[in-house]
Amino acid sequence: MAHCVTLVQLSISCDHLIDKDIGSKSDPLCVLLQDVGGGSWAELGRTERVRNCSSPEFSKTLQLEYRFETVQKLRFGIYDIDNKTPELRDDDFLGGAECSLGQIVSSQVLTLPLMLKPGKPAGRGTITVSAQELKDNRVVTMEVEARNLDKKDFLGKSDPFLEFFRQGDGKWHLVYRSEVIKNNLNPTWKRFSVPVQHFCGGNPSTPIQVQCSDYDSDGSHDLIGTFHTSLAQLQAVPAEFECIHPEKQQKKKSYKNSGTIRVKICRVETEYSFLDYVMGGCQINFTVGVDFTGSNGDPSSPDSLHYLSPTGVNEYLMALWSVGSVVQDYDSDKLFPAFGFGAQVPPDWQVSHEFALNFNPSNPYCAGIQGIVDAYRQALPQVRLYGPTNFAPIINHVARFAAQAAHQGTASQYFMLLLLTDGAVTDVEATREAVVRASNLPMSVIIVGVGGADFEAMEQLDADGGPLHTRSGQAAARDIVQFVPYRRFQNAPREALAQTVLAEVPTQLVSYFRAQGWAPLKPLPPSAKDPAQAPQA
């Protein structure tokens, strides 16, 4: 499971703080806390104190891990520091604000009003937070060939492969090993990419040793030759190096080399991350499809999967809240289309496989996750559960919007469809066709199985064992479906379902935009204060 975990740093500033000091302005400091569950908050860090300032811009950034698949609730507290003790209880509280880390990274720059307590603003005070990913996302891409390598095998030519080592801590560290090319003294190895940080520690002058060896199946590989270089020298393509065998060089005065290594391509490129796209303004458009087929059971019966408990919930709603609460932070307008399928709908009672939950086909958008919940509760008594379980219509519906977004040729939108269903899909072939077509578009499909039915067909759509194929043999361009049965998480922490089904989304989004060659949109520059007016701590 490829969780999206990376380190981000938060830059913080405030405006119009209330003054607690008599005869002067406050001396503010910001403390950052994270919700760790059970009503507890853990402190992650503090900025420096800025003296005598009501609109501080803190120079010390605060770092924390970012996880896409989790709602990371944060609390910022601003305090007027008038002593040297680390305790905050004896300092004046100037206001606080709460948000999620997802809101910060998707907003690029987030400004919130400071509150002294719920419902009581801290005057005109505001806090502004921006995030930056702490990551060297450069990769070095190379293509290398050799000429006239020494023959090492008695009954054939050599089976050469390359190894690249980085110098550090007085040792040589292996950073890349190529494939073996059998029986060839003039090989060209496959193009490869290595993170710059791993390849040379980020320093293009770091010594690099390259070894060319003859492969032996018992592990006793024979050295053909070696040379020393650096990333800076490798980039001077076409670069050519003599492959030297130290022992042969010492023994034979006439020794020249054991072949030459030629670097055909060596370039440093930026490999964009999920956060690069999100912080560049990419919107994640969230759509929900709910199964209203007869196999769910009569909603008025406590045995029905659609039965609403005395607290107004069921498995469908709990799954929706779990996933939706994470995704909603990445959609600026928080208007989500929501559909039902497999029911007879009024007024003509025809079976529909993509009816708007709010019964407004021209505007199926619901305001936030709560809006979807409200529409679902209102639709439930107005439809007749029927069948069959067809996924293709809703997948194709979302795919049409994804295709329009793709036509723009920018990394501005990505679509996520959440299907909540109680049983096996009926239109298997049509769904396969829809998923394979959608794999070429900026979208992902998440299926949550509700109830205890046999979900084997869903596992096939997940395609973790290999690419999904249509009946005609067309393969999916990438894996875009993630399926999980809800009951596997029934007794797990509430956030466990979202962590599992959303773990692959960052990789799916990045793989799509990378395949198209689309860089992130340029993020909006944070509003900067005049450095000449910045107070000193």
Curated annotation (Swiss-Prot):
GO terms for cellular component: azurophil granule membrane; cytoplasm; cytosol; extracellular exosome; membrane; nuclear membrane; nucleoplasm; nucleus. SMART domains: C2, VWA. It comes from the Eukaryota. Signal peptide: none annotated. Its cofactor is Ca(2+). C2 domains are necessary for calcium-dependent cell membrane association. C2 domains are necessary for neuronal progenitor cell differentiation in a calcium-independent manner. Belongs to the copine family. PANTHER family: COPINE, COPINE-1. Homodimer; homodimerizes via its C2 domains. Interacts with p65/RELA (via N-terminus); this interaction induces proteolytic cleavage of p65/RELA subunit and inhibition of NF-kappa-B transcriptional activity. Interacts (via VWFA domain) with ACTB, CCDC22, MYCBP2, PPP5C, RDX and UBE2O. Calcium-dependent phospholipid-binding protein that plays a role in calcium-mediated intracellular processes. Involved in the TNF-alpha receptor signaling pathway in a calcium-dependent manner. Exhibits calcium-dependent phospholipid binding properties. Plays a role in neuronal progenitor cell differentiation; induces neurite outgrowth via a AKT-dependent signaling cascade and calcium-independent manner. May recruit target proteins to the cell membrane in a calcium-dependent manner. May function in membrane trafficking. This is Copine-1. It comes from Homo sapiens.
